[in-house]
Amino acid sequence: MIQAIVFLPLLAALVAGLGQRAIGATASKILTTGALFTSCALSWPIFLSFVMGTGEAEVVTVLHWVSSGALQFNWELRVDTLTAVMLVVITTVSALVHLYSWGYMEEDPDQPRFFAYLSLFTFAMLMLVTANNLVQMFFGWEGVGLASYLLIGFWYKKPSANAAAIKAFVVNRVGDLGFMLGIFGTFLVFGTVSIPEILTAAPGMAGSSITFLGMRLDTMTILCLLLFIGAMGKSAQLGLHTWLPDAMEGPTPVSALIHAATMVTAGVFMVCRLSPMFETSEVALGVVTFVGAATCLFAATVGTTQWDIKRVIAYSTCSQLGYMFFAAGVGAYGAAMFHLFTHAFFKALLFLGAGSVIHAMHHEQ
């Protein structure tokens, strides 16, 4: 069941993308949208079983992936309460965005390519949230980055779209450098990349120190801060937020998908998933709280001065993500995830509403 949820969008993306000439635009659209609605229909029962309290956390092994010295891990799909919430958010919003794109992209000659990118994006995000080890999470993380680059620069004949896509890609690489260093450091300290093993061992590492750039620093603080830099890049927090407003150059359905449901929530998800690590470091939690609060105020203030309808919503998203990080920083992970869940739906609706307005005004923003 979980394999179907995760791999159906990938299958649809490959067929629609590579076979677009053979099967035509309409078949591509039907295939990708159908796959997404199937994934969505399969993920709701999982979510509801966790809501009712009957759901069991499980790990499904897909294949043995890497075995190199001490570095050994499988490709595994992990289903627990946190994953169940994200599955529902991602598949539902993505399915609705696919459906909306039928009308919105009607006159575009490159429809199969667009739908293939959307499905690929969804697959990468599902890969990220079902990850049971940090390397698989990084795979999903980079996949989302790549797909967002392709989608933001979808109208590649527009110079502004190209510039925005490259900007989003580069700013995210800055954050990803921190995330990579965090993963390397975690492997160095714990000797494993498996998330459950790391979270079990994390409290025991509290108070230990490590040499970093020639200074003795608290191990858990430095690891959590490096991981959080990754979250800042992906979730457009203060300092690495510059790509988010420019990412509005893509088609409106892309904005709804990237900025409401999926990509920007990856950072919040990661902080919540690794919360036992962050709990061991007061400093790291303080930084998360401060950055979240600062972003929340800053982005909302900037948003009030914008004239472009989509940019206003983009800054609003930035501000709401600040709230989520603030909640995570003060230890209210439930509140952070609840806000993530509710925000995804209303923000996607706002973007799609804005898209309808722009469409009706003949692309006047």
Where are these regions (language model features)?
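Hydrophobic transmembrane alpha-helices and their helix-loop junctions in integral membrane proteins
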Residues: 96-140, 146-365
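N-terminal signal-anchor/start-transfer transmembrane helix
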Residues: 6-21, 95-96, 232, 236, ...
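Hydrophobic alpha-helical membrane-embedded or membrane-associated segments
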Residues: 8, 13, 34-37, 264, ...
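Residue-level signal for short hydrophobic patches within transmembrane helices
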Residues: 4, 11, 15, 75, ...
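Transmembrane helix-loop-helix hairpins at membrane boundaries of multipass inner-membrane proteins
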Residues: 1, 19-116, 188-215, 221, ...
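Mature extracytoplasmic enzyme cores
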Residues: 1-7, 85-88, 138-140, 150
